[in-house]
Amino acid sequence: VELWDPYDDMASTHPLDRTLYVRHQAIRKMIERWGTNNGASAVVEHGANPGMVSHLVKQALTDITTQLLTDGKAGSRASSLQTALEAQQFNVLAQLTGTKVIHIAERDTQVSSKPKLTNEFCNTWSVEGFYEEGVAPAELGWGTHEKWMPANAHAHTDDGPRNQICLAQPGMESWVRSWVPSGDTLGMIIRHGESYTMTHHLTVKNTDGTDAYRPTVHYAYHPSDAAINSVLELRMRNWQMQPKERIFNDEIIDGRDELGVLLMGHDYKSWWTGSTLSIHEARAIIPNQSATTVQVAGSVVGAITWLLDCPSEGVRVPDELPWKKVLDATRPYIGPIHSAPSDWTPLKNRNDLFPGYGNDTSLLDHSDPWQFANFLAPTPY
């Protein structure tokens, strides 16, 4: 899905033409031209995210549904939820549970014994990969519940699912409120393929082919403190990459990578499912790596396991793989999976220092906490 030179003609290329949506649509049309998709197996975009997170969403929907049925909160939905659960109809489960928003919610707290230097970009994984994603337009799957769209948002008008929008601003400058088990976070809307595939596979159609239900899906990434400082310096350099790069490995002395999915809008408000792998746990699994790289590598192992067992299934995205099988193959590398509810909303702990004097009252929607404007930080005008 990546381009050899993604920076060519950046200023003159329309933001929509720089999206992963366009690239995924090109793959879909290529497969359609073949007339069949029964050749050698190939998995598109399967690391930790995109990749493992698609399976974690199915784990989360399974856990939410099971909890609703156990707690007696399902009400008139009980029979339909049970049927959809048994049939593994995750789009129906997402709709019936009331899931409106899904964040790939990640916070990296790994710290190094060697501080970031001036004019150096530091990260716990590929510096070049982060830069390429970060300067691209913020891109997100757009839910059917959304009432308001930012002024700089652009929607697709092609013959595809049109399940995404993009913002005419870099993902590194697009921040949202989110949550991980350690607490509230601010995350960047870095473009990722799961925003396309996950939204597409969780869509429920009306009989006339229109979309009856679709959640908002996007990345909410808070990297390590050194990477945050690197991004700030990159912005000060007017997006000209620093001359020095460093990927943290053996110099990491503490911290963890909380990487999971945050499903919001259902009866429990929020539910986070994912890996909370620490650097110490990661080193016990694979020496000389960070928690981040172990999570990614383990997720690749999961995909390879499926490829070896199913060599003639054609081109697939993570959402089309047997989620339990792939996730089970990944588990030895990501530590115990945390899956539990939280009563968090983007409005719960909000602290506007100048309430009523800014724009907080014009766009905040207290009647529906799961509106996109409630997540944006700062609140847009």
What is the role of each PLM region?
Residues 63-381:
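C-terminal catalytic/substrate-binding lobe primarily of soluble NAD(P)-dependent oxidoreductases
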Residues 56-60:
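Alpha-helical scaffold elements adjacent to nucleotide-binding pockets in ATP/GTP-utilizing enzyme cores
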Residues 46-55:
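Domain-scale recognition of functional cores that engage charged ligands
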Residues 38-43, 178-182:
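Flexible glycine/proline-enriched surface loops and loop-helix/loop-strand junctions
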Residues 8-9, 51-52, 113:
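Short catalytic/ligand-binding loop motif for oxyanion handling, primarily in non-cytosolic enzymes
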Residues 1-39:
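Rossmann-fold NAD(P)-binding glycine/threonine-rich loop
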Residues 14-18, 48, 291:
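Alpha-helix capping and helix-loop boundary segments enriched in small/acidic/polar residues
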Residues 2, 42-44, 104:
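General beta-strand structural signal in soluble alpha/beta enzymes
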